């Protein structure tokens, strides 16, 4: 079980507030400075108690032995992975805006005061709004999965699967969840993120006048889709990184 630290909690807080913040700045004429201040307050309200009460996990301890420490310390890997996540958010949001799907969806189920800023959106303006979310996605999804990979010689010996004696849960796990620890961690982190993001975004959207549940759920689902795509990319990144792991 992963130990949640101030880094994980801060990244999760940023990601769960990102959809609502983007909605406010793009469709409700809330300034980016005001939205950024709100996120900072939320991050600090969770991060400070976590920092005081919980120790750092191995991924954030420079002297802790990790098989993939070189990937966590690689500036190139960290920057490119952040840009990858940012790019996914930009493509999803830009595609939704330019196809008319996102605007039509929000207009139908939200009481949107103006679409002017939405029509003025460009990929660059979206990058500015979601770049921090891209960095947070890398920190919450990719880095813990890198850190979860056990050192050589420390893996728990796998028990051979015997269909004749296996229980139903063991059979289901073998057929549908037979992944290494890195992939399991990535799936776990993605599930946690999407659950918190979906529930939190729906709840916050419902505080806006004129919002219907279907609209709030649909908008949150768009971000869940983006996070799932990012996780799939990071799964591939982790697989390709296996060729360069240090033993």
What are these regions (language model features)?
Residues 24, 29-34:
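Long, mid-chain structured domain cores
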Residues 8, 12, 32-37:
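Hydrophobic alpha-helical membrane segments of integral membrane proteins
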Residues 1, 18-21, 34-247:
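Alpha-helical transmembrane segments of secretory-pathway, organelle, and plasma-membrane proteins
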Residues 1-26:
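Long, hydrophobic/aromatic-enriched structural stretches that serve as scaffold segments
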């Amino acid at each position: 079980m992963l130990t949640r630290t101030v880094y994980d909690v801060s990244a999760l807080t940023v990601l769960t507030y990102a959809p609502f913040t983007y909605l406010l700045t793009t469709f409700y004429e809330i300034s980016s400075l005001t939205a950024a201040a709100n996120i900072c307050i939320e991050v600090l309200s969770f991060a400070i108690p976590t920092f005081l009460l919980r120790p750092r996990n191995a991924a954030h301890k420079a002297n802790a032995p990790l098989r993939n420490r070189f990937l966590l310390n690689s500036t190139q890997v960290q920057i490119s992975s952040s840009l990858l996540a940012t790019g996914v958010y930009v493509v999803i949001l830009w595609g939704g805006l330019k196809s008319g799907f996102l605007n039509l969806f929000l207009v139908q189920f939200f009481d949107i005061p103006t679409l002017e800023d939405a029509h003025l959106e460009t990929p660059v303006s979206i990058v500015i709004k979601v770049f921090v979310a891209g960095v947070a996605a890398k920190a919450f999804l990719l880095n813990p999965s890198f850190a979860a990979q056990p050192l050589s010689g420390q893996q728990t010996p796998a028990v051979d699967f015997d269909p004749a004696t296996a229980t139903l849960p063991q059979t289901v796990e073998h057929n549908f969840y037979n992944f290494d620890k890195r992939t399991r961690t990535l799936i776990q982190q993605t599930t946690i993120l999407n659950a918190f993001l979906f529930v939190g975004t729906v709840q916050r959207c419902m505080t806006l006048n004129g919002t219907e549940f279907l609209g709030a759920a649909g908008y949150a689902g768009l971000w869940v889709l983006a996070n799932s795509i990012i996780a799939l990319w990071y799964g591939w990144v982790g697989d390709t990184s296996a060729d360069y792991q240090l033993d």
